[in-house]
Amino acid sequence: MVAQKSRLLARAFPYLDIFSVFALTPPPQSFGHTPHRRLRWYLMTGYVFYATAILATVFIVSYFNIIAIDEEVLEYNVSDFTRVMGNIQKSLYSIMAIANHLNMLINYRRLGGIYKDIADLEMDMDEASQCFGGQRQRFSFRFRMALCVGVWMILMVGSMPRLTMTAMGPFVSTLLKILTEFVMIMQQLKSLEYCVFVLIIYELVLRLRRTLSQLQEEFQDCEQQDMLQALCVALKRNQLLLGRIWRLEGDVGSYFTPTMLLLFLYNGLTILHMVNWAYINKFLYDSCCQYERFLVCSTLLVNLLLPCLLSQRCINAYNCFPRILHKIRCTSADPNFAMLTRGLREYSLQMEHLKLRFTCGGLFDINLKYFGGLLVTIFGYIIILIQFKVQAIAANRYKKVVN
């Protein structure tokens, strides 16, 4: 198994096991070589049937929620716009589940390659850092994983049912509400699965940056030709490892593109849908779920903020490399050493061309700048939606006065 080769994956696999229970990702134990091939085949066959059952459950939940939306629209006699928005939002349950299952099926080998690349990168980094005393502070990755992923997972799973159960209305049965909660939590956990891989990349970047800083300290005091050549070889190795991290980020981005794209779309549309119903219930009917709806919208936004924040931190750590290279150039004991000058030039050119972006299929970048733009867009649509509702209510009242 790849977890036996990588400490990072060994600490991330418990979270990935949880995601596999929700049929978001294949079981991590299914990757790698094992002598029990027949047992592995049986387990994977069972998991395929389990994932199919989850998909069928999502279809059922989506269908009956659409029926409930139609009944609620007829009961309250609201506009067809509310019906269309609600049906699209509920249909995204099925669309997101189909996209995720197809992504698992089509990109199964790619995900296995990502695990292998992470394990190989960690092993090569440990080997490259041995002459500098090895890597330090290994416990920090486990702490960051628990703080960023584990704590938010507990808060979200614990709070979502309390906030959304009542707001589903009387047209949804208790059993259907429970299944709907399961589907909603399942879809939101996709963001945390993405965060796990971002944290792994972030840890690899931090380790490589630490090694480069140690190289910079060695260059300050080194004047012997043989030692300078050895340090230049280590610098070149650091450059190649950073290029492999850049390629790893590209593979991770390609794997998560369809599901993260739909998650951003779903959360944005859900916020608009909940604001729409909050407005309807506030001004037309008596509602008891105003604060719950606000907290749900905040939860959906935080669940989008988390991957953007972690990606931005990783980008910032990656962008520190040119500054360290500049320090090496300025503080080296022999800055005119030809091999060092050539190595620094090649490294700097690589940093100019290989930018860490965490792009979502080239449509947008997952970072704080995009999240700010997303907030502006959502608030803009909310303002348009409220203006549309105010005009509709004013027109109806005018007709009543005239009649």
Swiss-Prot record:
Disulfide bonds: none annotated. It comes from the Eukaryota. Residues 33-48, 105-144, 213-259, 387-403 are extracellular. The keyword Membrane applies. Residues 1-11, 70-83, 166-191, 281-365 are cytoplasmic. GO terms for biological process: monoatomic ion transmembrane transport; response to L-canavanine; sensory perception of taste; signal transduction. One of its GO terms (cellular component) is neuronal cell body. GO terms for molecular function: ligand-gated monoatomic ion channel activity. The chain crosses the membrane at residues 12-32, 49-69, 84-104, 145-165, 192-212, 260-280, 366-386. Keywords: Cell membrane, Membrane, Receptor, Transducer, Transmembrane, Transmembrane helix. It is found in: Cell membrane. It is a multi-pass membrane protein. Its main location: membrane. Belongs to the insect chemoreceptor superfamily. Gustatory receptor (GR) family. Gr2a subfamily. PANTHER family: GUSTATORY AND ODORANT RECEPTOR 63A-RELATED, INVERTEBRATE GUSTATORY RECEPTOR. Probable gustatory receptor which mediates acceptance or avoidance behavior, depending on its substrates. This is Putative gustatory receptor 98b. It comes from Drosophila melanogaster (Fruit fly). The gene is Gr98b.
